[in-house]
Structure formats: structure tokens, C-alpha cells
Amino acid sequence: PKSATFRTADVVGLDTMCYVANTAYEKCPDDPEKDVFKLPDYINKMVSNKWLGQKSGQGFYKKVDKGIIHSLNLKTLEYEPMNKKRHAAFTLAKEKTYLRDRLNAIVRSDDVAGEFLWKTFSRTLIYSANLAVIIADDVYSIDRAMKWGFGWELGPFEVLDAIGLNYFVDRCKKDGVAVPSWLLDLKSKQISSIYAYLDGKKYFYNLEAKDYTELLYHEKHIDFQIYKSKNNIIDKHWSASLVDLEDGVAAIE
């Protein structure tokens, strides 16, 4: 989401976040990542202080004056002026127009921001891949749930494709991270993406069939990538593309 991690927590409310985290920790005893739901001491302290976020006027952020917002120092629990830092990863991202290209670039940046983002994304994507066969019938249902329910622009497996499946698998192995067998199987088959556009249709990798299956859309749904895969781009510039949707209709993306 555009509000990112801590601002989203403020909007949702730390009391709600804590309830969800505690419930997940207690009700998912066999979850391999259940320990991420253990709340750090500073969050418990914030809740006891009634610093619940937007609903209480302060949380991770606090508006101290008109147009002036301070952020919480997690070590001292005092509000301080925000010190915005410049990172090479952000510079690389700003050079890219599309989110997929930005994601591909930032995880390859060797500065502290790039390393942080790689560790965050890789852990999230490995978790998603490990549980894909348990929590859903197919990968696109997980992607849709994250986009429709949590405001992600791309679902986890779309993010993995954006990063690059081969790069992702190779770097995880280099980092000593166990890679789910089905991702290794994809790489061994020289399949380089979970989603594919072929002959004007979109396909997803079916974990049960171990092959691509066509993704069927509602008749009113428009996927620009399908038309772009058919070379239906009339004109393209750095900020937008004019795409032929056929039937005498064009659209700007």
C-alpha cells in the first residue's frame, strides 16, 4: 500500500494490529513463521500509553504542527523530526516508470536499502510459496486476495515474477535460504515465470497439474498485458502507453 508499513499500522490502529497479531500467534501453532507475530516491547508500551495511531492522534507518527509530522524513535520512544535519507535503491526505483521494473531494480541494489528490501521481499515470497499449496487452490487466488483485500498493487507471485524467478531462486540459494521444491522444479524445467502471456491469453503455473493453465477472466475485465503481449501498442512514451483494445477502442495506461 502507498501508506507503507508504519503509516498503515497507524491508520488501522495499533490495538487492532495487536489483536490480529496475537490471534495469529495463538491460532497458528504450526505456522513456520509464527514468531513474526510476537509483539516487540515498544509496541506493547505504545499500546499501554494509548498511542494507537490515527484514532488517538499519535502512534508511529505524530502531527506536532500544521504540516509538520514527527516520527517515533523506537529506542527512546520520543518523537523526533523525520530525517529522510537518500539511498541508491530509491534513485534506481525513481528511474523506472512501472512497478515491476522498480521492484526488479531495487532488490539488485547493493546499498543498505536494497539489502533490506531484498530480505523483506525474499522472506515474504518464500513464505507465500511454501504455503501456496495449503492455503489456496492456485497462486492467482493468493495474489488476488492480497490485492483486493490488502491494497497491494501486485500480489506476491506477481512480485516474484517482477524480481525474476531465476534470479530469486539463485540468490535465495546463495543466501542459504531453503527454496520450495515447486520453484526449483520450475527452474529445472527452464520456466522463467509463474505467469505467462501466450497468443493473447494469460496463463498461470498450476501447482497440481505442474503446467500452465489459462487464467479465465470475466468478460468485462481488461488486462492491458494481454493486449500488449499481442503487440497492440499504438504509441509509447516514458510515462504512458496507448494500447489498442480492439473493437475500435484504444486506452491510455
Per-range role (PLM):
Residues 1-253:
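N-terminal glycine-rich phosphate-binding loop for ADP-containing cofactors
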